[in-house]
């Protein structure tokens, strides 16, 4: 009887899924892919942020020592500090990213733009989709970074600064971060660091889809839906895309946590005027190697993250019976 009820419930769910428009199914598939992939690598993401922002007591540590220090200061749950904001952000971000990629790709092909029908279409559609998703969800990324930047050791609350002691602001959750950012800078405060983010996401998102789709084209048709195909193709796509754009990610993170840093000699904590000033200042004051701080852990993180993301997305598309692109494009 239990088996019969389970079968009925499963059939009801699939009947409901079948009534959804293709774009709605794509949104759900993308959101699920983003949430699962992001949570799987959350501990590594937090360590990367601490290394990128040169957080006190983490400046000279490697990956393994940083993991031990987070465990010492914040306990096991410390590895997931900021992950709530990250997941809340990544669900709409990934949903929009994958969905708008499909929309932009179909639109380019439908309008017969002079891009052909090969991988260049994936590059352009992926870049446009990445920019769209970032603009819609950036404040949540800002909140995630500020929460992940905090370390709960009491020695971190008071730090020697240029003007005596500087008390680092602390946040209880996403709502407080966003409220404080808006209070300090208005709407622009919610988008602090958006410049390097957009400059970085356009090539990264484009390259990610470009490389993934290009690799898929070399896979035999009978293996196109195989998990063993999605994992390595997604991993390589993420690896190449992140390497090229990583310095911009470092600038973004440092701009996002500026208000948590000690005051400068000018009496403020705004260190960078814009993206390129940030790149130049980091090289001049922190050394060029800081532009790649946390890159090793990012390699460890991005390979499973992108691989899991593409794999879950493709699996969800198959489960939800989303038709292949050739059949789903407008006539």
Swiss-Prot record:
UniProtKB keywords: Membrane, Mitochondrion, Mitochondrion inner membrane, Repeat, Transmembrane, Transmembrane helix, Transport
Q: Which GO terms describe its cellular component?
A: mitochondrial inner membrane; mitochondrion
Q: Which PROSITE patterns match?
A: SOLCAR
Per the UniProt entry, what is one GO biological process? Answer: mitochondrial coenzyme A transmembrane transport
Q: What is the membrane topology here?
A: Multi-pass membrane protein
The entry lists its GO molecular-function terms as: coenzyme A transmembrane transporter activity
Question: Which body tissues produce this protein?
Answer: Expressed throughout the plant.
Q: Where in the cell is it found?
A: Mitochondrion inner membrane
Q: What does this protein do?
A: Required for the accumulation of coenzyme A in the mitochondrial matrix.
Database matches in PANTHER family: SOLUTE CARRIER FAMILY 25
The similarity annotation says:
Belongs to the mitochondrial carrier (TC 2.A.29) family.
What name does UniProt use for this protein?
Mitochondrial carrier protein CoAc1
